A protein has these predicted regions:
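TRNA-binding/sensing appendages of the translation machinery
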Residues: 1-82, 127-171, 255, 259-260
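Conserved alpha/beta core surface patches that mediate binding of polyanionic ligands
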Residues: 5-26, 78-130, 237-238, 365-367
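Residue-level preference for alpha-helix termini and adjacent loops
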Residues: 6-10, 32, 40-43, 49-50, ...
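Extended, low-hydrophobicity, polar/charged segments
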Residues: 55, 85-89, 114, 118-131, ...
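Generic short alpha-helical segment signal, independent of protein family or function
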Residues: 59, 63-67, 89, 93, ...
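Short, basic and Ser/Thr-rich N-terminal targeting/leader segments
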Residues: 66-68, 97-100, 177, 238-241
């Protein structure tokens, strides 16, 4: 490509206020991208050459799996997986004659809900690679899953990208056995955590930590109810907080440490169905008591009690009364006071938490 044909306009003056990262500034000054309007930019000739090279790499690797290309219309109302599933149901002989079927499309799609308006590299249009694999048996599907994981690793490696294989959440099925391959980038929108000393990698919503709780030998003190004389932020000692949830019509009370944050995705995975918080006006409907009279020790028998792993061995802790922020319970001992409680991991991790494999601490990264 001759330099006279590169089309590198001087757009620094126009884009200077929006470009904050050095890598973004490089893409403009070197003639890869140009401005069009907010949240839209132009791929200049150099960028098109790079895109074609990437497409060639993708196509070469997919052909190794005997994958064939198809393409839906850009503005199609159907997702590709819906179209293909419907097609195969109508014409099952396409799959019966093969142990598996591999298809892919490289498609430009319009992003309806753009969250980062004004961010230069956030575009209303994105180009996606969708790859699909259909199988007669679960064994064949599982084997091909690992082939695809290696395929995407090869694609990223050939593009000279640093990447991580990360445990993730399938948001459609809420299954936590999914993996995502994320290319490291300080400008990325994907957040994940990594162990400082091992190969543990997980998205924030599914990441776990090593439980630090140990069984205490302290004597259980009598449970008492008191009135606040000081602010919760200034109060000494360990505190619990309670959440009132439901899985369908099943009422749930869940206990966390005051400093932890509830992760509803983990609770949903525990019940294998969607779990939501109960609105204050619905408390009586699901828990049989009005909010202002709520007593967690005298709820209906069908209520399920849950506690985070860090709660299990707490002794003589405190908790604000659910019915009044002016009152609190003292000397709560979960193993004594909630004998039917089930303990599991229900919290978001925090940076610096111990890695679940016991090696190092968790560090937050972007990609």
């Amino acid at each position: 490509m001759k330099q006279s044909n590169l089309l590198i306009p001087d757009l620094q003056r126009m884009l200077g206020e929006k470009i904050t990262e050095e890598s973004q500034r490089f893409l403009v000054k070197s003639g890869f991208l140009g401005s069009f309007q907010d949240n839209q930019y132009v791929f200049l000739p150099l960028a098109m050459r790079v895109i074609e090279n990437i497409k060639n790499i993708v196509t070469e690797e997919l052909e190794k799996l005997s994958a064939v290309e198809f393409q839906l219309p850009v503005q199609s109302s159907l997702h590709a997986e819906e179209y293909l599933s419907t097609l195969l149901l109508k014409e099952p002989e396409n799959l019966q004659n093969n142990t598996s079927m591999q298809l892919y499309q490289i498609q430009t799609a319009l992003i309806a809900n753009q969250k980062k308006a004004g961010h230069f590299l956030t575009n209303f249009e994105s180009t996606y690679l969708d790859a699909f694999s259909f199988h007669e048996t679960s064994v064949s599907l599982s084997e091909n899953y690992h082939r695809y994981e290696q395929l995407f690793r090869r694609i990223l490696a050939r593009c000279d990208l640093q990447f991580q294989s990360v445990i993730a959440l399938n948001k459609e099925t809420n299954q936590q056995d999914t993996k995502e391959i994320i290319a490291d980038s300080p400008e990325g929108d994907e957040h994940y955590c990594a162990s400082s000393e091992s190969d543990y990698r997980a998205k924030i919503e599914v990441a776990t930590r090593l439980c630090s709780g140990k069984k205490s030998h302290a004597s259980y003190l009598p449970l008492v109810k008191k009135t606040f004389a000081e602010n919760i932020e200034e109060a000494q000692g360990q505190w619990l907080k309670s959440y009132f949830l439901r899985a369908g019509k099943q009422p749930i009370v869940l206990f966390l440490r005051q400093e932890d944050q509830l992760n509803l995705a983990k609770v949903t995975n525990f019940f294998k169905q969607k779990v939501v918080q109960v609105k204050p006006k619905e408390i009586e409907k699901y828990f049989g008591q009005a909010r202002e009279m709520l007593d967690v020790w005298n709820l209906p028998q069908e209520v399920t009690y849950l506690g985070d792993l860090e709660v299990e061995f707490l002794t003589n802790t405190k908790m604000i009364a659910p019915h009044s922020e002016q009152e609190y319970y003292e000397n709560i001992n979960p193993l004594r006071d909630f004998p039917n409680v089930a303990f599991a991991d229900f919290c978001f991790v925090k940076e610096g938490d111990p890695s679940p494999d016991g090696q190092g601490v968790l560090i937050f990264k972007k990609g």
